Amino acid sequence: MMTRLETLKNNLQATLGQDIALTEALGELTLEVPADQWLTVCNKLRTDAGLRFESCIDLCGMDYQTWGDGSHANAHDEPARPGRFAVVIHLLSIEHNWRLRVRTYAVDEEFPIVASLIECWPGVNWYEREAFDLYGIVFEGHPDLRRILTDYGFIGHPFRKDFPLSGTVEMRYDPEQKRVIYQPVTIDPREITPRIVRESSYGMGR
């Protein structure tokens, strides 16, 4: 008798083809989708009777610029990431009671673009705005793609790995101008804790 995870895997292969990039780890399935097929595949995931992922419960951006640098990740011989910026969604099928993680990578690192999924799941509207605000990922087809967390005049995207930890500008009230102004950040970066790279077997009971 097949497990629920095996049934989901078979249904995904039946709908999307046997050659889909599907990985299983820790009792979860992750589907990798090329950026140019992102919207098409997600529509199938939502509408196909054997899948029926009616709900997108989360969407986030990722920046893999420093992935594996000085960590134990390389010890596991993980393949190189196909791009710097990725979009990850977590889907829920209420009808079949199963979940799926889906990921796509933006092709252009300088100007990352991914199709908006509002057509599939209208509830991702603010999730996509958040990923745009924090990572600079542009969601093509989004009806109102503007910042949602940072200030209107904010420059840059604070969750990118190359964004300075102390920021670039700060706000203060200027008593002479009697208004809030921006000025270059006055905080001096200070590292007081050495970076520790743990051995590859750390936390694995070995």
Curated annotation (Swiss-Prot):
GO CC annotation, single: plasma membrane
Keyword RNA-binding: no
Assigned EC number: 7.1.1.-
GO MF entries: NADH dehydrogenase (ubiquinone) activity; NADH:ubiquinone reductase (non-electrogenic) activity; quinone binding
Location(s), subcellular: Cell inner membrane
Homology family: Belongs to the complex I 30 kDa subunit family.
Annotated NCBIfam families: NuoC_fam, PRK06074.1-1
Purpose of the protein: NDH-1 shuttles electrons from NADH, via FMN and iron-sulfur (Fe-S) centers, to quinones in the respiratory chain. The immediate electron acceptor for the enzyme in this species is believed to be ubiquinone. Couples the redox reaction to proton translocation (for every two electrons transferred, four hydrogen ions are translocated across the cytoplasmic membrane), and thus conserves the redox energy in a proton gradient.
Protein name: NADH-quinone oxidoreductase subunit C
Annotated source species: Bordetella avium (strain 197N)
